[in-house]
């Protein structure tokens, strides 16, 4: 087979909450930025319908085209504005602006002009400019003529708003509010007190929103207050009123379409609706899960949506009832558990919300569910010391899950708990089995299960800074009836009071390797006797893993000083070593390959090798500009068939890695979106739409029609081809009219697709309904004659040979007479 080059692709994990989400005009779709992609979701099914990719840097703004509601604009840090057909996921046009674009606005009555936030030459200084997008038939258009509007603004789009149908624009930064009137070409500036006393220290502006119909500006502040500004046409006569409910900073504001209500959100995880600008008349939607960062309103006014700090988008009905949740990969402060794979669901498992493990589908790029480990109510307070989930590991094909949580207010007060969870087939989830308080006297640095199939009972090993590693086994004597099972400590090991840093089992489970700072110890898992030690004196051991399959006799280790070592367990000596600053080392559980990601001055480099050979099989430089923190091999549902030795490591597993900014990347030959044609994307979109009464009736009709066709085909000599299976007709019916070629070009293709091929035999005895009534007597009278004619034709065919094949029977002549009566004059109209 012809193999394509392996390249790094973003497979998910990008921030969905980087900018405000945008609704389509009919509220069927919601658009959100996701790294350098734009994702199109269904508001009812929560499924991703399309992924719009074409930008080379982060997408910083999206808006529906006011001139064509089936099109979407997007701007990016790459300095371009792209116009999309979001129904089919097609890029229509690219406008090259030049500078880095931070925000994007299209007010009413803009007349092909858009407003952009760009950076000046000075750091942290931004401008609001306008640019006219020229009308051109070319797909790549340059629009570099920028018109200055406002200076010294905040780059966040939440700090700029257009009001009263685009008559003015309001911008806030620090303690200043600026209002620019387009007709008057005048700017009014307003300032709040900014003294250092406690009363005025939190007057700083955080966001702004403008009333769609009236001259009213709403601003949010650090102290949780909302100010409604009026009479701001003059610097002296302005007034404002205060609304106060939030105890912390107001994160975002949004007016409804009619302007009768104002929506606000903050760190309280509560959406507040202020009706008629009154503090007494407000409604709440509480317990949204995490801080609200953005608020959006649909053009029809029937839906709201909130973007949250845990990379989640919540779709809300007008009556403040949450209807859908689009959950991305949760961005935790630190991924201390690393990347794991659930053996049952093949989902990616890592830290999620505080105190939770998230199970994330790599195929669907969405969260499956959260597992609450700490089981405590989370209090959003920066000064409060939270209980953190630090370690986790799966064992026994996903039957057991071990987690470690800790809380430490100071160096001398450490709260440590280890929990063992058992998978319940009845509840289809993990149930807490054993909770162990203070399993070690210091922080737990590593834990691992013995997953060898030869061992009937599971074994868990934990390593700690207290200088010990402990072996935990499952016992059934936790009560007098011996019906309950629980985990208990079976063995405690140490080595010269060094801190234990890593631990891992061999593939067959017979050996346990535990690293104590710079020394690696090998233990017999049956008797827990120390077999041998390896001392490389090249720094503390950072990673430790055994080889697999043909390389099971090797042990790999990396050090803090940038040394990669390979030891031979049979000869108890070092096999080879290399100078490599390895940050991530992961063995493939389904092959003998090992992936190592090393940090260099230019970025992160990938090395794939076998422990038996010091020469790497595959090297790819600069897989990421930033540091790679975690990696994991995920088994494929359908194995690949790469024949090249450099690509065989991708056959059974796929390597995923997580960067410092928590972007999830992988290696592939082709992205999933590139494998889809526009027609198949449209079909996918239709399949993701909800089942309506009409579609239910239509589906039953199609099933009945298909059953009739099946019954008819059993009695017919030949079945006519169905139009659903003809590519030309499918393409014509499912492609939007505005992207189709001219009718004259499609006519010949469409008509030819309806014609029968030469190889298809004509049906002999399938009369029409009309013909059954009109020619009933004729068929009866000619039945005997047809049989006689067929006998004669059979005898003549024997004598005449091929010449007899071209003679027509009586029934065939009748079929031809039917076709002569058909009116084909409609073809001339095309």
From Swiss-Prot:
The modification Phosphotyrosine is found at residue 785. Keywords: Isopeptide bond, Nucleus, Phosphoprotein, Repeat, Ribosome biogenesis, rRNA processing, Transcription, Transcription regulation, Ubl conjugation, WD repeat. One of its GO terms (molecular function) is RNA binding. GO terms for cellular component: nucleolus; small-subunit processome. One of its GO terms (biological process) is positive regulation of transcription by RNA polymerase I. This is WD repeat-containing protein 75. It comes from the Eukaryota. Residues 761-807 are annotated as: Disordered. WD repeats lie at residues 4-42, 46-85, 89-130, 144-183, 192-230, 236-275, 278-317, 323-361, 375-422, 429-473, 486-524, 528-568, 573-610. The keyword Transport does not apply. The modification Phosphoserine is found at residues 663, 671, 778, 781, 811. PROSITE patterns: WD_REPEATS_2, WD_REPEATS_REGION. Ribosome biogenesis factor. Part of the small subunit (SSU) processome, first precursor of the small eukaryotic ribosomal subunit. During the assembly of the SSU processome in the nucleolus, many ribosome biogenesis factors, an RNA chaperone and ribosomal proteins associate with the nascent pre-rRNA and work in concert to generate RNA folding, modifications, rearrangements and cleavage as well as targeted degradation of pre-ribosomal RNA by the RNA exosome. Involved in nucleolar processing of pre-18S ribosomal RNA. Required for optimal pre-ribosomal RNA transcription by RNA polymerase I. It is found in: Nucleus, Nucleolus. There is a cross-link at residues 426, 675 (Glycyl lysine isopeptide (Lys-Gly) (interchain with G-Cter in SUMO2)). Component of the proposed t-UTP subcomplex of the ribosomal small subunit (SSU) processome. SSU processome is composed of more than 70 proteins and the RNA chaperone small nucleolar RNA (snoRNA) U3. The keyword Transcription regulation applies.
């Amino acid at each position: 087979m012809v193999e394509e080059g392996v390249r790094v692709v973003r497979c998910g994990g990008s921030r969905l909450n980087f900018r405000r989400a945008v609704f389509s005009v009919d509220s069927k779709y919601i658009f959100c930025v996701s790294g350098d992609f734009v994702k199109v979701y269904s508001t009812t099914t929560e499924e991703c319908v399309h992924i719009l990719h074409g930008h080379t840097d982060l997408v910083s703004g999206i808006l529906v085209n006011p001139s064509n509601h089936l099109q979407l604009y997007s701007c990016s840090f790459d300095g371009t504005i792209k116009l999309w057909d979001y129904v089919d996921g097609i890029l229509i046009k690219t406008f090259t602006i030049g500078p880095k674009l931070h925000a994007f606005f299209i007010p009413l009555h803009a007349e092909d002009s858009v407003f952009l936030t760009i950076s000046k030459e000075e750091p942290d200084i931004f401008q609001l400019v306008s640019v006219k997008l020229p009308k051109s038939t070319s797909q790549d258009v340059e629009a570099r003529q920028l018109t200055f509007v406002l200076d010294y603004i905040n780059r966040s789009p939440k700090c700029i708003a257009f009001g009263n149908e685009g008559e003015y624009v309001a911008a806030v930064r620090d303690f200043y509010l600026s209002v620019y009137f387009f007709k008057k070409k005048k700017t009014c500036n307003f300032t709040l007190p900014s003294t250092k006393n406690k009363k005025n220290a939190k007057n700083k502006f955080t966001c702004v929103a403008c009333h769609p119909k009236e001259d009213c500006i709403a601003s949010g502040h650090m102290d949780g207050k909302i100010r409604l500004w009026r009479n701001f046409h003059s610097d002296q006569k302005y007034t404002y009123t205060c609304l106060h409910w939030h105890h912390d900073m107001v994160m975002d504001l949004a007016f409804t379409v009619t302007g009768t209500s104002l929506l606000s959100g903050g760190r309280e995880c509560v959406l507040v609706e202020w009706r008629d600008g009154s503090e007494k008349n407000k409604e709440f939607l509480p317990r949204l899960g995490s801080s609200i960062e953005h608020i959006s309103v649909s053009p029809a006014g029937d839906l709201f949506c909130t973007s949250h700090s845990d990379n989640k988008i919540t779709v809300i009905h007008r009556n403040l009832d949450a209807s859908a949740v689009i959950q991305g990969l949760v961005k935790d402060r630190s991924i201390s558990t690393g990347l794991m794979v659930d053996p049952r669901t093949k989902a990616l498992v890592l830290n999620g919300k505080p105190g939770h493990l998230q199970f994330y589908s790599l195929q669907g790029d969405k969260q499956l569910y959260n597992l609450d480990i700490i089981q405590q109510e989370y209090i959003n307070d920066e000064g409060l010391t939270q209980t953190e989930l630090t370690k986790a590991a799966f064992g026994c094909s996903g039957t057991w899950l071990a987690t470690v949580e800790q809380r430490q207010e100071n160096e001398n007060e450490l709260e440590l708990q280890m929990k063992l969870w058992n998978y319940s087939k009845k509840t289809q989830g993990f149930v807490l089995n054993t909770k162990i308080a203070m399993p070690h006297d210091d922080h737990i640095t590593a834990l691992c299960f013995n997953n060898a199939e030869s061992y009937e009972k599971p074994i868990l090993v934990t390593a700690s800074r207290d200088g010990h590693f402990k072996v935990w086994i499952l016992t059934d004597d936790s009560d007098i009836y011996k019906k309950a099972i629980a985990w208990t400590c079976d063995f405690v090991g140490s080595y010269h009071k060094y801190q234990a840093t890593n631990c891992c089992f061999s593939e067959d489970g017979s050996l346990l390797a535990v690293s104590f700072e710079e020394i690696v110890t090998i233990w017999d898992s049956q008797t827990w006797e120390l077999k041998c030690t390896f001392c490389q004196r090249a720094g503390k051991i950072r990673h430790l893993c055994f080889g697999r399959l043909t390389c099971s006799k090797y042990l790999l280790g990396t050090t803090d000083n940038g040394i990669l070592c390979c030891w031979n367990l049979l000869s108890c000596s070092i096999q080879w070593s290399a100078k490599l600053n390895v940050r991530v080392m992961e063995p493939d559980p389904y092959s003998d390959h090992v992936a190592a990601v090393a940090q260099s001055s230019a970025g992160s480099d990938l090395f794939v090798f076998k422990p038996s050979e010091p020469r790497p099989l595959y090297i790819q430089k600069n897989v990421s500009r930033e540091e790679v923190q975690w990696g994991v091999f995920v088994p494929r549902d359908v194995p690949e068939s790469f024949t090249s030795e450099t690509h065989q490591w991708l056959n059974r597993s796929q390597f995923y890695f997580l960067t410092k900014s928590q972007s999830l990347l992988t290696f592939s030959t082709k992205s999933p979106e590139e494998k889809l044609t526009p027609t198949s994307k449209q079909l996918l979109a239709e399949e993701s739409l909800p089942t309506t009464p009409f579609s239910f009736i239509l589906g039953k009709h199609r099933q009945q029609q298909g059953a009739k066709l099946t019954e008819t085909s059993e009695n017919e000599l030949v079945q006519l081809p169905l139009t659903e299976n003809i590519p030309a007709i499918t393409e014509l019916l499912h492609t939007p009219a505005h992207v189709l070629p001219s009718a004259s070009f499609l006519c010949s293709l469409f008509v030819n697709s309806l014609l029968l091929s030469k190889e298809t035999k004509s049906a002999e005895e399938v009369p029409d309904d009309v013909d059954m009534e009109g020619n009933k007597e004729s068929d009866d009278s000619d039945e005997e004659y047809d049989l006689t004619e067929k006998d004669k034709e059979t005898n003549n065919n024997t004598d005449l040979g091929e010449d007899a094949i071209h003679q027509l029977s009586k029934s065939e002549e009748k079929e031809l007479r039917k076709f002569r009566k058909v009116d084909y004059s409609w073809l001339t109209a095309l």
